[in-house]
Amino acid sequence: MTLVHPSPHPRALGVGVIGLGRAFTLMLPTFIADPRVRLSAGFDPRDEATARFTAEFKANVHTTAEALAADPAVDVVYVASPAEHHAAHAIAAAKGGKHVLVEKPMAQSLAECQSMVDAADQAGVHVIVGHSHSFDRPILRTCELIASGVYGAPKMIAAQYYTDFLFRLRRPAELDPAQGGGVILNQGAHQVDIVRLLAGAKATSVRALAGRWDATRPVDGAYAALVNFEGGVFASLLYQGYGHFDGDELCGDVTELGQRRDRRQQGAARRRLASLANASEEVAAKAARNYGGAEQVSYASDDLAHQHFGLVVVSCERADLRPLPNGVMVYADSEATLDPLPPPRIPRVEVIDELCAAVWDGKPPLHDGRWGMATLEVCLAMLDSARENRDIALHRQVAAPAITSH
């Protein structure tokens, strides 16, 4: 697959947003900066969010997903609601004849994923699952280097990241394993997407361990997994979200969102949480920092590097490749060189590239519904493996095509 650069188009795609929470807040700088899309409609139960949305974007506001999907100003529905609602909202969008961009995890069960894929197929619309960090330009560039054949085939992939994920502000559902809480479903999707893309083959099985060692956050906060692929490639995945060591140190002190890391913020998530008296205060504090809240956080920056998801190393037959926020390090037989990338003009622009290429040019998206379902299958298998202490075979996998540059 050649990386897509959509044809110019005279009219921006109208994006209807379901869920004006944190995921939307993170995507907002992209929607604002990219002229190929415009925010045309929104749906959220919080009055303060919809009021600001209407005022800021002169957009329509709806009270149901079905009404938003019927809005003629909407071409694409961005499903950024909590994961337990993804299937219902994506299906409503497809039935309304709208293309779907849905946040990860795609859903909470494979049956839900299949129903989303079926609805999109029946309606003749595209489903794209993202943003995930497999969209990041350094990851895609690494895929291009692999596809060139210069460094031989990939044989082993290592991915690891240490964050404060578990101690960021959370809703009660996010701390309930029965409702999909924990890092495996919510952060594992990033790493699984990345290693599947880099391996370029179908995953066949997974073995995982999960860590849960803080009673105040009673969900999995860490994991280690080994994923096997057809052709003998294997990948190790490690993630820890307890807010001590910061994995951004291994990425040039650039944060996950591509911003310069402020070392004074070490431990900030734990300090903020410790200042709150109970779960109700935590929910209120989270809402205040989301779109429309009194303390809304801006993620826009004029000094951006590429986004990342921690340390990733691909061991090929003749070199190790390491994607970084400013390019890809190539550790070859006789020298180490940087394959540089220019800084991004727009954060997460690759998501809009893929979306516009699908809608305008009919190019099959890389991160389609079947891709998202395969990633969820691996994540669910990681949970099963950790619980049952055994390898779990995978049955719904799809392989990524080789990604080449022009």
What are these regions (language model features)?
Residues M1-F57:
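N-terminal Rossmann-like dinucleotide-binding module
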Residues G241-S315:
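Contiguous C-terminal substrate-recognition/catalytic subdomains in enzyme active sites
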Residues T50, H89, M116, T142, ...:
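Aromatic/hydrophobic pocket-lining residues that form π-stacking "cages" and hydrophobic walls in ligand
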Residues M27, A59-A119:
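Beta-loop-alpha module in the N-terminal Rossmann-like domain of NAD(P)-dependent dehydrogenases
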Residues T63, V102, V127-V129, A158:
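Hydrophobic residues in well-ordered beta-strands that form the structural core
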Residues A41, V76, M156:
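Short, Asp-centered acidic motifs that coordinate Mg2+ and/or phosphate
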Residues M1-H9, V76-Y78, E281-A305, G310-P325, ...:
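C-terminal helix-rich "cap/oligomerization" subdomain common to oxidoreductases
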Residues H126, H133-P218, A222-L237, G241-Q259, ...:
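Predominantly a Rossmann-like dinucleotide-binding segment in NAD(P)-dependent oxidoreductases
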